[in-house]
Amino acid sequence: QIIDQLENIGVEPKIVTLKKDEEVYDCHLAKVEYGVTLLFVNVTESVNATKMRQEFFSNVSHELKTPMTSIRGYSELLQAGMINDPKVRKQSLDKIQKEVDHMSQLIGDILMISRLENKDIEVIKHPVHLQPIVDDILESLKVEIEKRKIKVICDLTPQTYLANHQHVQQLMNNLINNAVKYNKQKGNLNIHSYLVDQDYIIEVSDTGRGISLIDQGRVFERFFRCDAGRDKETGGTGLGLAIVKHIVQYYKGTIHLESELGKGTTFKVVLPIIKDSL
């Protein structure tokens, strides 16, 4: 490819894009007095970032369009008086509410990731109890958990952690939602928190599909979704785990992932305990 370009190179420099071993390079070709210069620039990161942004906006567009279509359809039927059965009317209104909640969550995730990346986040901290936060999240997922007969095992330390309540709620919500979303029928969901030395540790495990070794290295990236084709049935924008990682890093903690395809996934969050956090 470069040789072909060299044969046609004129006075003006040329840029040729090359791919090798999943890496992308821009090759800058220019004539000099005694020949030709070639400058190779690795643009893989830039190309991947552009691709991920395009996929993200495509996902967001789809995630917004689907509930909007549903809301409009049910609203038009109700407005036209075409749904007279009280039970069916309630089901229609419940569906509208569910879609509104979905859009609200989507918009909230987009705003959250933007604030985290721009370091524009709330810093007021209070002692946070994990139990009521987890209870509220499980209650919001009760229908899905019961429908799929997922067994929930919850063992949380009564100790508090000094943090912003919204951050802890967002962190737990994203981890638990994923554990339910990707779990198998009659699977297990384990939520634990405990203290080890000067660390406050949270573990969320499921017995679902698992994450491949290749994807494990990228699950915390913005916009990334494991096996995008397979995820169409579950939805999502690829922001949940990116938000989790940003929150954990804000508290100078770490997050670890253990997973095996077909057996499940465990996320382990380690947060350092600071003075007066208990």
What are these regions (language model features)?
Residues 79-87:
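Short acidic helix/loop segment immediately C-terminal to the autophosphorylated histidine
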Residues 98-103, 107:
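Short alpha-helical segment of the dimerization/phosphotransfer core of two-component systems
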Residues 186-198:
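Short beta-strand/loop element within the Bergerat-fold HATPase_c
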Residues 211-223:
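Short conserved segment of the HATPase_c
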